[in-house]
From Swiss-Prot:
Primary site of residence: membrane
Family per record: Belongs to the glycosyltransferase 28 family. MurG subfamily.
Gene: murG
Protein name, as recorded: UDP-N-acetylglucosamine--N-acetylmuramyl-(pentapeptide) pyrophosphoryl-undecaprenol N-acetylglucosamine transferase
Subcellular localization: Cell membrane
Organism: Enterococcus faecalis (strain ATCC 700802 / V583)
GO BP of this protein: carbohydrate metabolic process; cell division; cell wall organization; lipid glycosylation; peptidoglycan biosynthetic process; regulation of cell shape
Length: 363
């Protein structure tokens, strides 16, 4: 079988695709893959490192306001469809899977015109513009949140979950916290604002720092590279020298860390949600206000409804509120266990299997 995968722009579109590819490689080693992205997108750095054949087309996104740039966008979209058709004819895939981003719009639409079976994978609780456009043309639509089904044709839509969820459940308990100077036997909260960090979360952590004194739990905080030096300088002048806190610029083995902690605090991106729910980890989510259609708030609300997470709006985040929310969960074993059970219930630990079954129905 030959599978062409396309998606890009953000890690939320790329990492689920890579998790799926790795799963299929184990299940059916003879399967051939080709990943189509853009030369300037994050995928151009990540996919080749994963040793997956990679080709590019040139495309850009629409401006949401009236802009002459949109004429160029339309031109690039039309020319990219022709380029995508050329790539598809050369590779001759049995199925094409789009995981989001403008590049998948051109490639999946081109595959539809060439009468090749197509699937789109929607990670969020509100669909992106590309997947809304493609939904009328594709054969199947794989979703991660039941709520998003209402945006798509019922007969095409299947709840598969996010392949990242299946990848993380294989991670075992370890003493990884000792690598950060923390005690693996103590309750621990991991706090982060995404790969680049988040200013509001950073400010709240700085306010919260002295409040963590004499807590029974530990705090592992990933500030993001761009805030790390500034934060270190600020904390240097703090009167408190706390041994139950570790501050890192970035945590490379985040999934392994989450598998060995008791609570996660961070943004409400689809990939993070797939990971911590698969692990059955309770969370405090601070949705980013800077994403399209405010989809992170919708992602978080779907989990608040079932009691798996608590949500703090970005505009309301302070150090005191952050510590109070962490205390309320980590110092209350019954509540933490109830949230963990609810989180596990929302996880889909066989997401790659489910998506692979959808592929096999089309081939």
């Amino acid at each position: 079988m030959k599978i062409l995968v396309t998606g890009g722009g953000t890690g939320g579109h790329i990492y689920p695709a890579l998790s799926f590819v790795e799963h299929v490689k184990k299940e059916a080693p003879a399967t051939e893959f080709l990943y189509v992205g853009t030369e300037n997108g994050l995928e151009s750095q990540i996919v080749p490192k994963a040793k997956i054949p990679f080709k590019t087309i040139k495309i850009q996104g629409f401006k949401r306001s009236l802009s002459p740039q949109n004429f160029k966008t339309i031109y690039l979209f039309l020319t990219s469809i022709n380029k995508a058709k050329k790539i598809i004819r050369e590779f001759q895939p049995d199925v094409v899977i789009g995981t989001g981003g403008y590049v998948s719009g051109a490639v999946v639409y081109a595959a539809h015109q060439l009468k090749i079976p197509t699937i789109i994978h929607e990670q969020n609780s509100i669909p992106g513009m590309t997947n809304k456009f493609l939904s009328r043309y594709v054969d199947k639509i794989a979703i991660c949140f039941p709520d998003v089904a209402s945006f798509f044709p019922k007969e095409k839509t299947i709840l598969t979950g996010n392949p990242r969820g299946q990848e993380v459940v294989t991670v075992e308990k370890s003493a990884i916290l000792s690598e950060f100077g923390l005690d693996p036997a103590k309750k621990t909260v991991v706090l982060f604002g995404g790969s680049r960090g988040a200013l509001k979360i950073n400010q709240a952590f700085e306010q919260a720092f002295p409040l963590f004194e004499e807590r029974e739990y530990q705090v592992l905080y990933a500030s993001g590279e761009r805030y790390y030096q500034e934060l270190q300088e600020s904390l240097k002048f703090s009167e408190k020298k706390l041994t139950n806190i570790s501050v890192q610029p970035y945590i490379d083995k985040m999934v392994e860390v989450m598998a060995n902690t008791d609570l996660m605090v961070g943004r409400a991106g689809a990939t993070s949600i797939a990971e911590f729910t698969a692990l059955g980890l309770p969370a405090i989510l601070i949705p980013s206000p800077y994403v399209t259609n405010d989809h992170q708030t919708k992602n978080a609300q779907s989990l608040v409804k079932v009691g798996a997470v608590e949500m703090i709006p970005d505009a309301e985040l302070t150090g005191a509120r952050l510590v109070a929310a962490i205390d309320d969960i980590l110092l209350n074993n019954e509540k933490r266990q109830q949230m963990a059970t609810a989180s596990k219930g929302e996880g889909i630990p066989d997401a790659s299997d489910r998506l692979y079954q959808v592929v096999k129905t089309l081939v």
